[in-house]
Structures are given as structure tokens and as C-alpha cells.
């Protein structure tokens, strides 16, 4: 018989730096056990934020699933900016190439709701547009259709 799920919680911690605290206290798990396991699994991911889904069972056991870093984080990293534009449709803050867009799409593909790289690129491009980041050659790529 499957374990009864009591709660699911989506949280985000810096890679290798999860600490017991208020965010974890509300989840109702063994915090030291989680932080050790999380930090061990994410230590090699540098300073990037790591989203995690924690599933808590009735017997207080838990399991967690790690996800890829947020798209906005990857875009700011590649574009070498601190944050996106507050007026995205009027003020462009950076430009990235189509190859860089594809690189992010390939990285994010396991967590997106598609298996098609072109669809993933369109999703990432939407986030870039909302952040005021232009993509060189994107309009031509769209007109041309899929690669």
C-alpha cells in the first residue's frame, strides 16, 4: 500500500546552502536530515537557486525532487545583468543570441511541459521578452519555422 501524502511544499534554496529555518519548519520534516541530503545533492551547482518539491508522508518521512534553476536566473546569468527591466516593452536591458537561448532551453527541457526544443525556446523567449532581454535573430528564426 502506498504511503499517505500529508503535504507537498515547493521551496527554493541556494545550491548546497539549505539551512533549518522558518521555511522548512512549516513543512514538518526532519530539517537536519533534509538539509544534509539537499546540500549533498546540490553542492556541485555553484550558487544557483534550486527549486525543490518536498513530499511529506503521514509517518513523517519525506522525499524531494530537485528542479532546474529558474529561467529568469539563467537569463540574467547569460545576459550578465543583475535583474530584468521594469519596463520590458520600452526599455531593453540586454541582448542574447539564438545559440544562448537554445542552451537555456536544453538545460530547462526536463522541467518544461514539452519535449520539443523549439517549443522550449519559445517559452524561454517569452520570459526573456518580459525581462527586457532581446534575442538576436529570433524574429527571423520564428519566420523560418522550426529548425
UniProtKB/Swiss-Prot annotation:
Family from the record: Belongs to the universal ribosomal protein uL11 family.
Lineage: superkingdom: Bacteria
Taxonomic path: Bacteria, Bacillati, Mycoplasmatota, Mycoplasmoidales, Metamycoplasmataceae
GO molecular function: large ribosomal subunit rRNA binding; structural constituent of ribosome
Annotated GO biological process: translation
Gene Ontology annotations for the cellular component aspect, listed alphabetically: cytosolic large ribosomal subunit
Post-translational modification, as annotated: One or more lysine residues are methylated.
Protein name, entry field: Large ribosomal subunit protein uL11
Primary role: Forms part of the ribosomal stalk which helps the ribosome interact with GTP-bound translation factors.
Keyword field: Methylation, Ribonucleoprotein, Ribosomal protein, RNA-binding, rRNA-binding
Assembly and binders: Part of the ribosomal stalk of the 50S ribosomal subunit. Interacts with L10 and the large rRNA to form the base of the stalk. L10 forms an elongated spine to which L12 dimers bind in a sequential fashion forming a multimeric L10(L12)X complex.
Species this protein is from: Metamycoplasma arthritidis (strain 158L3-1) (Mycoplasma arthritidis)
Chain segments annotated as coiled-coil in the UniProt record: none
CDD domains: Ribosomal_L11 (cd00349)
InterPro entries assigned to the protein according to its UniProt record, in alphabetical order: Ribosomal_uL11 (IPR000911), Ribosomal_uL11_bac-typ (IPR006519), Ribosomal_uL11_C (IPR020783), Ribosomal_uL11_C_sf (IPR036769), Ribosomal_uL11_CS (IPR020785), Ribosomal_uL11_N (IPR020784), Ribosomal_uL11_N_sf (IPR036796)
